């Protein structure tokens, strides 16, 4: 199993990244909470990973913080939650915010995430509550390990900030109309994609 990668960030297009490790390029999917802590392409990064093998694909998921990976692993063990939905949940809220939902029995916030219906939210509260202590310990002991060593100048990007933000939300399962409306209402002049996506997600929660 691949548990950790240290290499050069080659490309990043939310939620996917490409990391070069000794001449081998690893494609990963990351929750947006981790994705937007990455440096510019050309920098060295360290990410914690979870490897998923399916009949039709082998997928690698990456996380800046160990507690996010721990929560991801707990989520995919919950009934009805696969890697895609777990990634969506962690893109919509941080590990600490998710723990807060468990503590408050906050179904209303959880069901605002795409793919999370009332039954799934209720099931998550029941199944994850017993694991709350270990989640809190992991969250408090989180490690943040990435190194910025870049003099790399990224090539100009054709897509606008709004297009980048909408594309990221669509990849998480939001409907086109929902993503477009959230981005349009949250957009302010001078925002970068990270700020806009965070604001758009916040407006939907």
Curated annotation (Swiss-Prot):
Q: Where is this region: Domain I?
A: 1-64
**Does the keyword DNA damage belong to this entry?**
yes
List the molecular function annotations (GO) for this entry: ATP binding; four-way junction DNA binding; four-way junction helicase activity
Gene Ontology CC entries for this record = cytoplasm; Holliday junction helicase complex; Holliday junction resolvase complex
Q: Which InterPro entries match?
A: DNA_helicase_Holl-junc_RuvA_I (IPR013849), Hlx-hairpin-Hlx_DNA-bd_motif (IPR003583), NA-bd_OB-fold (IPR012340), RuvA (IPR000085), RuvA_2-like (IPR010994), RuvA_C (IPR011114), RuvA_C_sf (IPR036267)
The protein's job, in short, is: The RuvA-RuvB-RuvC complex processes Holliday junction (HJ) DNA during genetic recombination and DNA repair, while the RuvA-RuvB complex plays an important role in the rescue of blocked DNA replication forks via replication fork reversal (RFR). RuvA specifically binds to HJ cruciform DNA, conferring on it an open structure. The RuvB hexamer acts as an ATP-dependent pump, pulling dsDNA into and through the RuvAB complex. HJ branch migration allows RuvC to scan DNA until it finds its consensus sequence, where it cleaves and resolves the cruciform DNA.
Q: What protein name does the entry list? A: Holliday junction branch migration complex subunit RuvA
Native source species: Shewanella amazonensis (strain ATCC BAA-1098 / SB2B)
């Amino acid at each position: 199993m691949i548990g950790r990668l240290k290499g050069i960030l080659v490309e990043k297009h939310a939620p996917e990244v490409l990391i070069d490790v000794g001449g081998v390029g690893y494609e990963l999917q990351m929750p947006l909470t981790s994705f937007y802590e990455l440096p510019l392409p050309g920098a060295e990064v360290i990410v914690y990973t979870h490897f998923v093998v399916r009949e039709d694909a082998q997928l690698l998921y990456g996380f800046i913080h160990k507690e996010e990976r721990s929560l991801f692993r707990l989520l995919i063990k919950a009934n009805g939650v696969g890697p895609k939905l777990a990634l969506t949940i962690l893109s919509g809220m941080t590990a600490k915010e998710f723990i807060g939902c468990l503590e408050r029995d906050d179904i209303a916030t959880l069901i605002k995430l795409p793919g999370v219906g009332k039954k799934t939210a209720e099931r998550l509260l029941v199944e994850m509550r017993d694991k709350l202590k270990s989640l809190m310990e992991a969250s408090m002991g989180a490690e943040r390990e990435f190194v910025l060593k870049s003099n790399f100048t990224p090539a100009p990007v054709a897509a606008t900030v709004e297009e980048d933000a909408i594309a990221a939300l669509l990849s998480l399962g939001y409907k086109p109309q929902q993503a477009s409306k959230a981005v349009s209402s949250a957009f302010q002049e001078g925002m970068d994609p990270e700020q806009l996506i965070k604001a758009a997600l916040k407006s939907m929660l």
